[in-house]
């Protein structure tokens, strides 16, 4: 897959498809087991049953169904990060300020900033520059205050 740029436009449907295509024989067992454990602990936010998924294609099919069937989560974000070769920096509405993704060490040229509200919903964050809103940022040119928060929360930046 090509590197993402600020000129690329992705829809919810295309992002679901990109993430679904990142599910492989190598990562499928860990991904489906994570969802099964969430369901067993009543912490699962989907309108599908992880226990009924038996194949990569089954999981891919659930992921690409539009609407509230499959909520985006950290697993999907990691699949997108890998496919698009982009960092996701996730700010939280509580403490700590950053959502721990263990991916802030990735050395991708571009970053997308998300806001994780009330531990349930991701919102896209943009930065205004010259009356334009940019949602994809050059990682090395993030505003200083964002770098300061990352450094404070992760001791890394």
Where are these regions (language model features)?
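Papain-like cysteine protease catalytic cores
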Residues: 2-99
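Deubiquitinase catalytic domains
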Residues: 60-157
